[in-house]
């Protein structure tokens, strides 16, 4: 599921900024590595919000900081959190995963208030474009990990990090989906063994 999220959000930034910093080795013994690289290559024509120049994905602030220290311009940072699983009464779960989708711009140390305001305006427009795509994809039923209601019940909050020299906005989502980890299906299969 986390790999599906990675590939989904990889369709938004400029293609050149996706692999840079994420797939630094280029190959791995892990089978999924090559599969994901091929999926990224197939996104060549997407670039749904090409003004986003870089892509950062993960949970670690230290990794985020290392990555952002090496880039310039705007970036999409997708941070995934805990999955809350509640029985739905039909031998399945309703799963809720916290996802934070940040679009920010790294500015120079000497950026003034007007430059910060422009960066905030640009990144807010980029977040709105991503949100619109999420809404359309959820409405079409293309996101098994998020239903239509959860994409419209969200929050957009400012992202300000003096440490990262970055300013932008974060779309906070509680993505709800039916047993997104297929836990019940696995349990039924194990019971038959």
Q: Which stretches of residues belong to each language-model region?
A:
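Short, cysteine-centered beta-strand-loop-beta hairpins and adjacent loop/turn segments enriched
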Residues: 85-88, 106-111, 178-185
């Amino acid at each position: 599921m986390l790999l599906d999220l990675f590939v989904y959000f990889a369709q938004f930034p400029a293609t050149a900024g996706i692999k840079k910093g994420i797939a630094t080795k280029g190959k791995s013994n892990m089978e999924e590595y090559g599969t994901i690289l091929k999926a990224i290559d197939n996104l060549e024509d997407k670039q749904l919000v090409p003004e986003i120049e870089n892509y950062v994905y993960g949970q670690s602030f230290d990794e985020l900081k290392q990555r952002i220290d090496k880039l310039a311009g705007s970036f999409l940072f997708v941070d995934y959190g805990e999955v809350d699983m509640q029985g739905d009464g039909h031998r399945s779960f309703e799963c809720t995963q916290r996802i934070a989708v940040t679009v920010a711009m790294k500015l120079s140390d000497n950026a003034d208030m007007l430059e910060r305001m422009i960066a905030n305006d640009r990144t807010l427009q980029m977040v709105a474009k991503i949100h619109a795509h999420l809404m359309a994809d959820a409405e079409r039923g293309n996101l098994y990990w998020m239903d239509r209601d959860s994409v419209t019940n969200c929050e957009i909050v400012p992202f300000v990090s003096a440490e990262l020299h970055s300013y932008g906005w974060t779309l906070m989502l509680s993505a709800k989906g039916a047993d997104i980890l297929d836990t019940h299906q696995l349990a039924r299969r194990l019971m038959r063994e």
